[in-house]
Amino acid sequence: MTVSRDMTTLESNVFSQILSGTCEEPIPAQKIRGRYGMSKRQLENVVESLRVNFRIPIVAKKFNPNGYYIPRNEEERSEGLAPYKRQILTEQKNLSIIQSIDLEDFWNNKKAL
């Protein structure tokens, strides 16, 4: 679903920056944050808005050179999605473990830890 509004100036500026990146030379988050005086959380929110509201397929490299880019083919998309897939698997594992812990048993036996 796309949003029925225009991009904010900040969204447009961030989009322009990321658009100039490539898989080989992604745009570092620090560069974008520094240029527009944004916190890490603000940039993450803008990137999420661009993805969800405007359907821009922004991905990120988590290793050097790290940063944001828009994939130009399926190989680049797969490379950019790999860190997100690993993160989801880790979070699913954490969720499963936390949900499976018997809280009463934990608190009754916490002194044994």
Language-model-detected regions and their locations in the chain:
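Short alpha-helical segments that sit at the start of domains
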Residues: M1-S16
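Long, low-complexity, charge-rich intrinsically disordered regions
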Residues: S78-L113
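A short acidic, leucine-rich amphipathic alpha-helix
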Residues: P28-R35
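A short, conserved structural fragment
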Residues: R51-K62
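Short helix-capping/hinge SLiMs at alpha-helix to coil transitions
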Residues: I18-E25, S39
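Short amphipathic alpha-helical interaction segments
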Residues: M38-S49
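Nucleotide-sugar-dependent glycosyltransferase catalytic core
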Residues: I70-G80
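Minor-groove-contacting beta-hairpin "wing" of winged helix-turn-helix DNA-binding domains
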Residues: K62-R72
